[in-house]
Amino acid sequence: MPDFLSITLSGVPPSLTSGETSNLKWQWVDEGVLMLTPHGACSQSVVLSAGIHGNETAPIEILNQLVSDLLASQLPLAVRLLVILGNPPAIRAGERYLTADINRMFGGRYKNHSLTDEARRAEILEQKVGEFFASDPLSLRLHYDLHTAIRGSHHNRFGLLPYRTTPYCAAMLRWLKDSELDALVMHTSAGGTFAHFSSEFCQAASCTLELGKALPFGQNQLEQFRPITAGLRALVSGGQLPTRSTEAMIFYRVVKSLLKQHADFKLWVADDTVNFTRYPQGTLMIEQLNEHYCVEHEYEWILFPNPRVALGLRAGIMLVQMDENDLLQA
């Protein structure tokens, strides 16, 4: 099979939509969706996705290289694997999205949007992921959705765990640690993200990974992603990662979503504020009609501050630090 990313960017399906190598069988499932299956038995079903936001190119390049190495038999395959490039039109355009953010549409929320290509794409991805996991109901289900952040961060590599009412998968948490993430954030309410969909509707152990900053194709310094790249290669090949050698991962949970509900909304942070900036108790964070929010805990940290979002969307989230053991008792 030719280069996965090149075919996806061309907008033309490959002339051959299935095939096999000495190690695996592959199938072109849909535009930007490729399934790889090892010849032997396996106990894990893994979904790896990137490009849900089209301008977040580093994860796309990482997954494309992973697929190339698997197809060239330079890396063995030990899991059932579905690789997804989420929003091909936006990837071609180099834009975050064309009409609306797909990563707010999952869990059926695409039905609340007009019939755009991106709403249809969210529906297709839900269908393909659901079918993939359902075809092997006894396997361990994992989904990592790879992104890069719009702005800088005190933690360059961090993960976001979707809200769930049962404990998080210990094997997933161990992999996240050994892949040397700097921080992990636990959501405390349901959302429309791809990772939340696979967790809630497919019972997968899921996590959104934020890796560095969004840059155009060819400008990424992929060496800075070496730990997560090594983690992904070990995950799909059945290899073992060395025990974490960097500082311990820091854990956070969401305590407040800053929703922009009125035209007079004001987010009281500087335009150059980076993710995980800390604020002391009493600091005024937002003001709008009939609402203001001040930091309620001794310290809170802000994530994804963006006052320019449309009305009704989240302009940031506030976090507090938490103990790792709470994740296993969620």
Curated annotation (Swiss-Prot):
Cofactor annotation remark: Binds 1 zinc ion per subunit.
Catalytic-site annotation from UniProt: E210
Pathway given in the UniProt record: Amino-acid degradation; L-arginine degradation via AST pathway; L-glutamate and succinate from L-arginine: step 5/5
Gene Ontology biological-process annotations: arginine catabolic process to glutamate; arginine catabolic process to succinate
Pfam families on file: AstE_AspA_cat, AstE_AspA_hybrid
Source organism, top-level taxon: Bacteria
A single MF term (Gene Ontology): zinc ion binding
Residues annotated as signal peptide: none
Class of enzymatic activity (EC top level): hydrolase
Biological role: Transforms N(2)-succinylglutamate into succinate and glutamate.
Family to which the UniProt record says this protein belongs: Belongs to the AspA/AstE family. Succinylglutamate desuccinylase subfamily.
Protein name, per record: Succinylglutamate desuccinylase
Organism: Yersinia enterocolitica serotype O:8 / biotype 1B (strain NCTC 13174 / 8081)
Lineage per the UniProt record: Bacteria, Pseudomonadati, Pseudomonadota, Gammaproteobacteria, Enterobacterales
